[in-house]
Amino acid sequence: MDINITLIGQMITFAIFVGFTMKFVWPPLRKALEERREKIAEGLASADRASRELEVAKRQSAEILREAKAKATEIVENAYVRAHKVDEQAKEEAIAAADKIKSMAIAEIEQEKVKAKEQLKQELVNLAMAAASKIIAASVDEKASKKVLEDFVEKV
């Protein structure tokens, strides 16, 4: 095995090349690899954080939705209760108005009844006076008196 100068030259050149690469090429390459590893780790951490935040947001949105549904149900129930109260109040007012009208009608009927009785009494008095004066005028004839009284009774 002959070691000649070419082989030694190649070994020296290779050693210089390795030294040059270790000094000038390897550090930026290592730095780039390290930066890439950090970016990947940061991306994974960011994705993990985003996943957790998404989970929290989902829980919060579900809670907000639940609260909104509960509030909507409460509003509907309150509206139903209020409508029922208004309905009952309207019914009570209508019944009160009907009772008032009925009472007024009954009072008016009673007044008309009293008035009619008074008129009837007045007419009865007038008829009795007329009959009495006819009886006195015709007191001579008993038959005529009887007839006048019968006519009077028929009128009444």
UniProtKB/Swiss-Prot annotation:
> Where are the bilayer-spanning segments?
5-27
Protein origin, superkingdom: Bacteria
SUPFAM superfamilies per the UniProt record, alphabetical: F1F0 ATP synthase subunit B, membrane domain
Q: Provide the topology term for how it sits in the membrane.
A: Single-pass membrane protein
- Identify one Pfam family in the record: ATP-synt_B
| CDD domains recorded | ATP-synt_Fo_b
Q: Which UniProt keywords apply?
A: ATP synthesis, Cell inner membrane, Cell membrane, CF(0), Hydrogen ion transport, Ion transport, Membrane, Transmembrane, Transmembrane helix, Transport
One of the entry's Gene Ontology molecular-function terms is: proton-transporting ATPase activity, rotational mechanism
Q: Please verify whether the record's keywords include Signal.
A: no
**GO terms for cellular component:** plasma membrane; proton-transporting ATP synthase complex
Cellular compartments annotated: Cell inner membrane
Subunit structure comment from the entry: F-type ATPases have 2 components, F(1) - the catalytic core - and F(0) - the membrane proton channel. F(1) has five subunits: alpha(3), beta(3), gamma(1), delta(1), epsilon(1). F(0) has three main subunits: a(1), b(2) and c(10-14). The alpha and beta chains form an alternating ring which encloses part of the gamma chain. F(1) is attached to F(0) by a central stalk formed by the gamma and epsilon chains, while a peripheral stalk is formed by the delta and b chains.
Q: Belongs to which family?
A: Belongs to the ATPase B chain family.
What does this gene product do?
Answer: F(1)F(0) ATP synthase produces ATP from ADP in the presence of a proton or sodium gradient. F-type ATPases consist of two structural domains, F(1) containing the extramembraneous catalytic core and F(0) containing the membrane proton channel, linked together by a central stalk and a peripheral stalk. During catalysis, ATP synthesis in the catalytic domain of F(1) is coupled via a rotary mechanism of the central stalk subunits to proton translocation.
Which NCBIfam families does the protein's record reference?
ATP_synt_b, PRK05759.1-2
**This protein's name:** ATP synthase subunit b
UniProt gene name: atpF
